[in-house]
Amino acid sequence: MSGVVRTLSRCLLPAEAGARERRAGAARDAEREARRRSRDIDALLARERRAVRRLVKILLLGAGESGKSTFLKQMRIIHGREFDQKALLEFRDTIFDNILKGSRVLVDARDKLGIPWQHSENEKHGMFLMAFENKAGLPVEPATFQLYVPALSALWRDSGIREAFSRRSEFQLGESVKYFLDNLDRIGQLNYFPSKQDILLARKATKGIVEHDFVIKKIPFKMVDVGGQRSQRQKWFQCFDGITSILFMVSSSEYDQVLMEDRRTNRLVESMNIFETIVNNKLFFNVSIILFLNKMDLLVEKVKSVSIKKHFPDFKGDPHRLEDVQRYLVQCFDRKRRNRSKPLFHHFTTAIDTENIRFVFHAVKDTILQENLKDIMLQ
């Protein structure tokens, strides 16, 4: 019996040895595969780290209506990403809304300011317009908008409405209303589609976070726009991680205007207070902060007739001399900085002027790369 067992054992040994060898080979293969996967993961992580280091993340900050969204639209136009049909229709809806709401504001302001109609028959046009309501916020169809075009045209020609417009610093009115009313014949056509200039002037408050990615000479850029109204500012902190630079936008022409949110606070003072908080935050010690004093086109016109000294008594110089006003504005923001070791980069801009923004951003891009990405050389 024992002989039979020994014989069976000798027969089984080669089979067991082969099985052990196969198991060992499978284990070696699994180990090699695990090492290969680990190398692939390490390589992927390294590429992602390099991409993150190369990414230029620019945060657009500033009070509401300072021009951040317009600047972002310019980046899209300048860097070749066309607006599709859906976007154009959305801009058309916004423009119709801007015109109707802005005209209603003017009709209401004329009444409250006690300005008489030039032509009494325009009162019925005003009543027709004031009866318009869109509480649901639904898009206004071109055919519907056309019904209001005759009333809008007649009202805009009336000197009473024009006088109310000239006193717009006394109430809240969108800055693009005049442009759109001046172009009403074109915009009122049934087949109207917005031009690039129309798109730049279309005003819709930013809610949430809007991003735009583009590449300049192999360097990836991410530009982030966050709503500037007080109710939206708590969202700013969601965007602070990994930022390379902050472009702080200021509406330089609003030194005689108050906030829409509280109707008391001077808009320029509000911008200065926000800037002071941002520029002195320890989170941004190594972040370049560039000041954009925007709406230069409006500042040029306003300086001629509205004295900044009336609203900022510490102003020294000629309140109707553009260079004096510009110097004062820069000084106001510069004084808010506690850390004087870094220079304050600033530019006067007109966000609706594509060539101006193209020129300014070229300089800003170089500043950002020199200050924050000295290890990256543009090809």
UniProtKB/Swiss-Prot annotation:
It comes from Mus musculus. The keyword GTP-binding applies. Keywords: Cell membrane, Cytoplasm, GTP-binding, Lipoprotein, Magnesium, Membrane, Metal-binding, Nucleotide-binding, Palmitate, Phosphoprotein, Transducer. Guanine nucleotide-binding proteins (G proteins) are involved as modulators or transducers in various transmembrane signaling systems. Activates effector molecule RhoA by binding and activating RhoGEFs (ARHGEF12/LARG). GNA12-dependent Rho signaling subsequently regulates transcription factor AP-1 (activating protein-1). GNA12-dependent Rho signaling also regulates protein phosphatese 2A activation causing dephosphorylation of its target proteins. Promotes tumor cell invasion and metastasis by activating RhoA/ROCK signaling pathway and up-regulating pro-inflammatory cytokine production. Its main location: membrane. SMART domains: G_alpha. The lineage of its organism: Eukaryota, Metazoa, Chordata, Craniata, Vertebrata. This is Guanine nucleotide-binding protein subunit alpha-12. A lipid is attached at C11 (S-palmitoyl cysteine). Residues 198-206 are annotated as: G2 motif. Belongs to the G-alpha family. G(12) subfamily. The keyword Coiled coil does not apply. CDD domains: G-alpha. Residues 221-230 are annotated as: G3 motif. GO terms for biological process: cell differentiation; embryonic digit morphogenesis; G protein-coupled receptor signaling pathway; in utero embryonic development; intracellular signal transduction; negative regulation of vascular associated smooth muscle cell migration; negative regulation of vascular associated smooth muscle cell proliferation; regulation of blood pressure. Changing C11S: Abolishes palmitoylation and transformation activity. One of its GO terms (cellular component) is neuron projection. Residues 349-354 are annotated as: G5 motif.
